[in-house]
Curated annotation (Swiss-Prot):
Cell wall formation. It is found in: Cytoplasm. This is D-alanine--D-alanine ligase. The lineage of its organism: Bacteria, Pseudomonadati, Campylobacterota, Epsilonproteobacteria, Campylobacterales. Gene3D superfamilies: 3.40.50.20, ATP-grasp fold, A domain, ATP-grasp fold, B domain. Mg(2+) 2 binds at E301, N303.
Length: 350
């Protein structure tokens, strides 16, 4: 099976998406049919596989590549005789941050009837906004850390105790994130987060907690639904991954080691993953990052499009992607009818 990779987008994570796409090329190799770049002007470009290097984009030379356009069922390119479809494959949405994870691209691909791997509109909106994610997780029976919402109109903490972590509500990759240990540090952290978003989430910061990452998706095996789980990773013990470390994290291609944890904890993490995934993220390969505090599992965040789609957590990443591509959700078909208009005209004719 071949995949087309859509990357770029207009977001603070634009460069990360490029790095992620270059890494995915190393992992998928000949399984990639086309690379499609969405630039900062929302124009699509067809990038030759042998040109997929980060310098192409930073230099602006990507504009020398073929510009392509969306039509129903396919991307097309202009020719002397009109528009010619590019052979379509299952598309991988690899746009991190806004455009890719906020539901914009999902809506566009759905509208033009292009099959794609990635979060759908509702799950994009829910997971892109950290406040919505907290509400969603609580409704699904998954625990979250204590938090408050700060806005420009109401920027004051009410009850949460220091230390805290401040995050822009709609941003990833540790951009605009800071740990606040005491009140005198609050103004700086708040100003930093407000540079990126008008809403901030303030969470209790627990140092020394165990953190585990688990990726996966749901597919069908015959008539049965089954989950394809990755191994569970215990990430770096560094207090907070800064942007540069997250940037490098998105370029990973070597498989990591399974965390040394009990089978009971594995089952707990997988159970919480399923609570979040079911009837929400079908068609997407997601990664959930969890905290474990006093043997209780808490959701840290949902990554609806993890860096290089968390290939480094899977033993058979291509196999999982292929299974998922054959199990994409189908929209209910709506038959448009004009019977009421016809009845009105018929009645008027009388």
């Amino acid at each position: 099976m071949k995949f087309d990779v859509l990357f770029g987008g207009v977001s603070f994570e634009h460069e990360i998406s490029i790095v992620s796409a270059v890494a995915l090329k190393k992992v998928l190799g000949e399984s990639i049919g086309n690379f499609i770049f969405l630039d900062s002007s929302h124009r699509f470009y067809l990038i030759p596989l042998d040109s997929m290097k980060s310098k192409l984009f930073s230099s602006g030379d990507y504009k020398k590549c073929t510009e392509i356009f969306l039509q129903r069922g396919a991307f097309v390119k202009k020719t002397f005789f009109g528009f010619k479809p590019i052979i379509p494959h299952t598309l991988i949405n690899l746009i991190h941050g806004a455009d890719g994870e906020d539901g914009s691209v999902s809506a566009l691909l759905d509208f033009y009837h292009l099959p794609f791997i990635g979060p759908r509109i509702e799950s994009s909106v829910m997971s892109f906004n950290k406040v919505f994610t907290k509400i969603f997780a609580a409704q699904r029976g998954v625990k979250v850390l204590d938090y408050e919402i700060l806005t420009r109109a109401n920027p004051h903490l009410k009850h949460i105790a220091y230390p805290i972590i401040l995050k822009p509500a709609r941003l990833g990759s540790s951009i605009g994130v800071s740990v606040i240990n005491e009140e005198k540090e609050l103004d700086y952290g708040r100003d930093l987060a407000f540079e990126y978003d008008d809403t901030i989430i303030a969470e209790s910061f627990k140092s020394g907690v165990k953190e585990y990452n688990l990726a996966g998706c749901r597919v069908k095996n015959g008539s049965q639904d089954e989950y394809r789980f990755s191994i569970i990773e215990e990430p770096s013990k560094k207090e907070l991954l800064d942007f540069e470390r997250k940037y490098l994290d998105f370029s990973r291609t070597a498989q990591v080691l399974q965390a040394d944890i009990s089978s009971a904890l594995v089952a707990k993490l997988q159970e919480n993953f399923m609570k979040l995934y079911e009837n929400a993220f079908e068609g997407a390969l997601i990664r959930c990052d969890f905290f474990v505090i006093d043997d209780e599992v808490y959701l840290n965040e949902i990554n609806p499009i993890p860096g290089s789609m968390a290939n480094y957590l899977f033993e058979d990443f291509v196999g999982v992607l292929t299974e998922l591509a054959y199990n994409l959700p189908k929209k209910h078909s709506i038959k448009v009818s004009y019977k009421y208009i016809e009845q009105i005209h018929y009645a008027k004719g009388k």
